[in-house]
Amino acid sequence: MHVLLLNGPNLNLLGQREPGIYGCDTLATIETELTREAKADGVELVCFQSNFEGALIERIHQAMGESQGILINAGAYTHSSIAIRDALTGVAIPYVELHLSNTHAREPFRHQSYLAGRAVGVVSGFGAKSYSLALSGLVHHLRQGG
């Protein structure tokens, strides 16, 4: 099973940017740990991060025929990108939206997600553990025939 992990804008700054909200783990640390967890579960995880909407969309398109599932932390694009939603809808690959922080406990503009309505599920608010929980949920969904 092949799963694509997508991380959006500013997530390359994890560990430095607002640690009180996002925690102290770097993106590299999160990706390394999640890759280890995935491998132990028989899943090949490919990680991609970009601060650019078009690059994320291109990577979603490339996942067609290669990935059975997508994990996506679109960062601020969650609340603004119809284009990313359309790309995810267009490739028809099951995906889980995830966030480090509980977006519903933050500013009102973060309460809306353009991605959640088409997602298999949403995980938020558990810090770096959100990635592991999202992977577990997606793999379970895919193995159940989703």
UniProtKB/Swiss-Prot annotation:
The keyword Membrane does not apply. This is 3-dehydroquinate dehydratase. It comes from Synechococcus sp. (strain CC9902). Keywords: Amino-acid biosynthesis, Aromatic amino acid biosynthesis, Lyase. Substrate binds at N73, H79, D86, L100, S101, R110. Belongs to the type-II 3-dehydroquinase family. InterPro entries: DHquinase_II (IPR001874), DHquinase_II_CS (IPR018509), DHquinase_II_sf (IPR036441). Catalyzes a trans-dehydration via an enolate intermediate. GO terms for molecular function: 3-dehydroquinate dehydratase activity. The keyword Amino-acid biosynthesis applies. PROSITE patterns: DEHYDROQUINASE_II (PS01029). One of its GO terms (biological process) is amino acid biosynthetic process. It catalyses: 3-dehydroquinate = 3-dehydroshikimate + H2O. The active site is at Y22, H99.
